Amino acid sequence: MAQVDLLNVKGEKVGTLEISDFVFNIDPNYDVMWRYVDMQLSNRRAGTASTKTRGEVSGGGRKPWPQKHTGRARHGSIRSPIWRHGGVVHGPKPRDWSKKLNKKMKKLALRSALSVKYRENKLLVLDDLKLERPKTKSLKEILQNLQLSDKKTLIVLPWKEEGYMNVKLSGRNLPDVKVIIADNPNNSKNGEKAVRIDGLNVFDMLKYDYLVLTRDMVSKIEEVLGNEAGKALTA
């Protein structure tokens, strides 16, 4: 199995953590990663852009001047696309831009992105990362200890509780830092708890240079992505 150094918030090595090769050390599939990012960005589009054609703009029923004997170019409507305030040719109309990707491809894309970070030595795992209260200075000091103060950093934390939420609030004023909180366990249809990693996504992992996880988050990721069947996954 692959191994990573386990660090504390002071940047000190406190141990070694074995991580799944199936999740963190596969040959990245860049095609599937692109498909995932394309799906993400497409699903963000509102699809509300709308223009009017020459048949929808107001006016234009009367011919502006006679066809002949004026010395001017012939025109049939003031709402022609070549006129100012005329209709728009082939303009956008409201549409649904959303795309879908099957669960296996989503998982493969996430494993590929995680493997890219691991192989580039840009994956850091902490024993834990909590703050007693939201304070940007405290998080900034932790990033300095990890030698990430001037790096674009994505921090992914396992669930919503006060200590983790304080980290998320502390990161709002740091322009190169994004903190993602994975959702709480949700009830599945059969009544069992489903572990979810909804916040983890390929786009953010590729956008930010370094990925910071906690030990609990690694376990959660391996539980969801460590096998091809069963676990809940949304994006």
Curated annotation (Swiss-Prot):
Free-text comment on this protein's domains from its UniProt entry: The structure indicates that the N-terminal domain may bind to the 23S rRNA, while the C-terminal domain may bind to the mRNA, which could then be implicated in transcriptional and translational control of the S10 operon. However, it is not known if the S10 operon is controlled in this fashion in this organism.
Keyword Nuclease in record: no
Family (UniProt): Belongs to the universal ribosomal protein uL4 family.
Pfam families according to UniProt: Ribosomal_L4
Keyword terms: Ribonucleoprotein, Ribosomal protein, RNA-binding, rRNA-binding
Any one of the GO BP annotations: translation
Role, per record: One of the primary rRNA binding proteins, this protein initially binds near the 5'-end of the 23S rRNA. It is important during the early stages of 50S assembly. It makes multiple contacts with different domains of the 23S rRNA in the assembled 50S subunit and ribosome. This protein only weakly controls expression of the E.coli S10 operon. It is incorporated into E.coli ribosomes, however it is not as firmly associated as the endogenous protein.
InterPro entries, per the entry: Ribosomal_uL4 (IPR002136), Ribosomal_uL4-like (IPR013005), Ribosomal_uL4_dom_sf (IPR023574)
Subunit structure of this chain's protein: Part of the 50S ribosomal subunit.
Name of the coding gene: rplD
Keyword Nucleus part of the UniProt annotation: no
Composition bias, Basic residues: 65-75
Protein name: Large ribosomal subunit protein uL4
Span list, region Disordered: 45-75
Other remarks in the entry: A protein containing 11 mutations, chosen as amino acids which probably interact with nucleic acids (K140A, E141Q, Q144K, Q147A, S149E, K151delta, K152delta, I155M, P158G, W159E and K160L), gained the ability to regulate the E.coli S10 operon, suggesting it is now able to mediate contacts of L4 with the S10 mRNA leader in E.coli. This mutant protein did not associate any better with E.coli ribosomes however, indicating a separation of residues interacting with rRNA and mRNA.
MF terms (GO), sorted A to Z: DNA binding; rRNA binding; structural constituent of ribosome
GO CC annotations, alphabetized: ribonucleoprotein complex; ribosome
